[in-house]
Each structure stands twice: as C-alpha cells, then as structure tokens.
Design a protein with these regions (language model features):
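Thiol/disulfide oxidoreductase modules built on the thioredoxin-like
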Residues: 285, 292-340
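Conserved redox-active cysteine motifs that mediate thiol-disulfide chemistry
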Residues: 226-227, 234-251
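Hydrophobic beta-strand anchors of alpha/beta hydrolase catalytic cores
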Residues: 231-232, 264
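N-terminal targeting signals for export/organelle localization
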Residues: 18, 132-203, 342
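N-terminal "domain-start" segment that seeds a small globular fold
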Residues: 189-222, 287, 334-341
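Structural microenvironment flanking redox-active thiols in thiol-disulfide oxidoreductases
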Residues: 243-283, 295-302
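Bacterial Sec-dependent N-terminal signal peptides
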Residues: 1-30, 340-342
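A non-transmembrane, solvent-exposed segment enriched in polar/low-complexity residues
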Residues: 18-142
Length: 342
C-alpha cells in the first residue's frame, strides 16, 4: 500500500512540475487599426527569403506563439508592403498596438530593444514631422546612447545607410561605437557587406559593363543606349509600389525620351517569365525590359547594390553614376541640370 501511495505522490509532483513549467515560446499579441481581417508575415534577418511564420489578423486582433532559441531580429511585413523590425527572445510576451498604415508609430512592449525603438520613434515622430537634419541628429544620439541595443543596427540602416547619398565616414564612425556583440550579429554583418558593395557603385563612381536578357531572349547591353542618360529601374510585378511608380514614370518617359537623350531600362526581379511579361503588357510599359528570372539574386541587383523596391540608378553616357534612388522630381531636376550644361 505504501508503494502505491508513493507512486501516486511522485506522479502528482511530476504533473505539478510540468504544469508550472514556463513556456519558452514567444507570445505575440496585438491590436492593429486599419486591419480588419488580414495577414502579417514574420521574416527573419534575410527578409527576402527567410519567412518565419504567418500571422492571421481577425477583426484587427491577433495572437501567435513563435518558437525561438535565442535573441533574434525579425521583420513584420504588412499587407500594404510596409515593414517594421521586431526583436524576440525566449519567453518574451510581446504586445503590439497601432496602425498598419503608420508602422513607424507602432507601440511594441516586451523586450528592451522593442521598447527602446518605440520610445525613439514616438518622441521623434509623435508630434510634428521633423526635418531631415533633426532626424539624423536624433538617430545619431540614439546609436551613441544605445551601443548594446539591436535597435541601433536598424537605426543605423534606416537613417544613414538608406539615404540616397550615404555619408560613409559617418556610418563607419557610428558602427565603431557599437558593442562587439552587435558587430557579430548577422544583420550587422550583412549591413557592412552591403556598404562595401554600395561604396563601389555610389554616386560619382563608374558603372562597369552589364547585360541582361530582354523580353525576346536577346541580351540588352549598356552599349545599346549609346549617348543617352539611362535610368535603371528595378521593379517586380508582385510589388504594388513598383506598379504605381511605373505608371508615374510613363509620363516622364513620354516627355523626356527624345528631347533629353534619356531612356529607361526596366530590371525586373520576377522569377516567372510569363507573369513578368504579362505585367509589362498590362501596364503598357514602353521602355526596354530585362529580367534574368533570379529574383533578388539577379546579377544587376548585386552589381548595383540594390536592397529595396522600387529602386533606380541614373547613368550618364560615360557610365558615371549620376544618382541613386531618385524621386521623379529629382530625376526631372537632374535632367534639367544636364540640359543646361549642353
């Protein structure tokens, strides 16, 4: 009888221990305005390929458990194409609130890096829209005061690396302020590798020879645009932002292609030839189109250090890089400036 009681008592202890064991999963929960029933994608550091999970939003709310082994950087990508960084560690209870239309003002509780970035954005953008100089000053102060925070890598990337004309000396100076543990993170390693590539094709540098298969299968070469200013326009059929930018470029192309010795070469990141061709036809894009069907591994993506879509690089007839990631207004101003020099 004593053996039976002992066995029952031991089993009860085991069940109690199991019941008290804290889950090491991350619990994500949130309320998002402007998202009744939608989908949010969760990506790892390589947000082009490394999808971690899919979050289904119902009536603006969601709850999701995510399994992680250590502190990780991730990305929330919303249905409108907007994205926002997220930091998760084992057993974190993370609450997200705000509007999917304004991810820069999301409030994220749980994990110090999330809360630090939330405070930074709310203090900076919570009231009036700050000037570019004010944003850069605040971003620099954040990095210097948070040398151990994963959020500092994002701030460096967003507000310094992604500028149309990055200040490489400033970026290197700020990266040196970061703790060694941050420099070993994959996100930071990728960022430094990108900077090395970008510096070789920054404004003022010369673009090397390139070619890309056209819609008819024949190669399109840089020499096909002799004596013309060429806008390399990186896009993809699956990006709504790209399709909208293409529509805006059509009017510019119509006005400038003959008068300013200006041309456009569309460089698609599609991987399906028929889908790519259908998009070109449906959007009635008149300029030449090239695609090697390799997505983000496309040769010109690496050659010109492209990380976002839509994106553009303006080349002079000599091959000199005149501008990167220009707005339509900046393209028009650059062409007007060039015309005055003739």
């Amino acid at each position: 009888m004593k053996k039976i009681y002992l066995a029952v008592f031991t089993m009860a202890l085991l069940l109690a221990a199991c019941g008290d064991k804290k889950s090491e999963n991350v619990r994500l929960s949130g309320t998002l305005q402007g998202m009744a029933d939608d989908t949010v994608y969760l990506y790892g550091t390589d947000r082009y390929y490394n999808r971690l999970d899919t979050i289904f939003v119902k009536q603006g709310k969601f709850v999701k458990d995510i399994e992680v082994d250590t502190l990780v950087s991730a990305w929330l990508q919303f249905g409108n194409g907007m994205e926002y960084p997220l930091y998760m560690d084992k057993a974190d209870l993370i609450e997200i609130s705000g509007s999917a239309d304004k991810p820069g003002l999301l409030a994220i509780k749980g994990n110090p890096a999330n809360e630090e970035l939330t405070r930074f954005h709310q203090e900076l953008f919570g009231k009036d829209l700050p000037s570019e100089a004010a944003v850069e000053k605040a971003a620099e102060a954040f990095i210097r005061s948070h040398p151990n925070s994963l959020a500092s890598i994002y701030v460096l990337d967003k507000y310094f690396v992604q500028k149309s004309v990055p200040d490489f000396s400033k970026i290197k100076e700020l990266s040196e302020q970061m703790a060694g543990s941050l420099k070993d993170r994959l996100y930071m390693e990728q960022l430094l590798e990108y900077l090395e590539s970008y510096e070789k094709v920054s404004v003022g540098k010369s673009a090397s020879y390139f070619q890309i298969p056209g819609m008819d299968g024949k190669d399109i070469r840089r020499t096909d645009f002799k004596d013309k200013y060429l806008l390399l326009y990186f896009w993809a059929s699956w990006s709504d932002a790209c399709r909208e930018t293409s529509r805006q470029l059509k009017q510019l192309y119509k006005e400038k292609k003959n008068r300013e010795k200006f041309d456009i070469l569309g460089v698609s990141l599609d991987v399906d030839k028929e889908v790519w061709k259908d998009a070109v036809v449906n959007d009635t894009l008149d300029w030449k189109q090239g695609c090697d069907l390799k997505g983000w591994n496309a040769s010109l993506v690496g050659q010109f250090a492209v990380r976002t879509l839509p994106y553009n690089v303006l080349l002079a007839p000599s091959g000199r890089i005149e501008g990167r990631n220009l707005t339509q207004k900046e393209i028009e101003e650059k062409l007007a400036e060039i015309a005055k020099k003739k």
